[in-house]
Amino acid sequence: IKFRNPQLEELSVSFSISGFFAIDSSSVKFDLSRYPWSVPQQGVGGIKLHTMYDLLREVPRMCLITGHEERDQTFMEDYPYEKGCLYIMDKAYMKTKGLFTIEEAKAFFIVPIKRNVKYLVLKDDTKHDNPIEVMADRTIEFTSRWAKAGYPKNLRLVTYYVEEKGKAMQFLTNNFKLPAEKVALLYKYRWNIEVFFKWIKQHLRINSFYGTSANAMMIQIYTAFTAYCILALAADAMSYKGSLYDFANMISVSLTEKVYVRDLIDRYQEMSEDKGDPLLPSLFDF
């Protein structure tokens, strides 16, 4: 699949970063009476989808299904990190040993620092010509025994004022070449994986299940992920610019009517141009 995000593609070229990935999880809750094998949490059952999402191509790279009782950071040391790529996570993944696994893979990460983490400032790299939102840019090292044992090398800590939230946020990264404002900008792209989770839950029906066994549930979820990737591949091959949801609807028409998908796409795009805008916002526009 070709790159779909020109801003990230530009950053990839400018700073020699091979790829950008968001890592996050999403829970699916269900009734314990129908799924008694699930470990109860607050009176309900559930599963968790641990996902690595390709931000450049806007497709999932991998998905691991576990019980919803598993912590997000449990599998940090098992993800297939690639040399030269950058991984963006929320503070649930602030596990020093897991972050050092990314460092050892010669990859990069961006993650918000937790409030209770103790560190020593080694160097202040804040530049006077930084955007006003950049409050500080420092080189630090962990000082607590457990944190330093997990991550013994120096790190970069960027403090950035987020206007939308009305507060400052601090981001840890092992990339010392990116401008401080780009570190904060890249963290915003983590939202794309949330959009992906919302999309598959709404349109590929993974909130209700046909079977009640754990195996049946996993088959349905992995089928949904596979269907999403196939749709994305087909849309990319045909240079389709509309929403993936509309593309899926067009594919369903071609199952009952003998018509080329290319003709359906041309017909839809003509309708969209007549109306001024696509009928639905594109997932790939986020």
Please provide the spans of the model-predicted regions.
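Positively charged, amphipathic N-terminal segments that serve as targeting/anchoring signals
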Residues: 1-2, 7
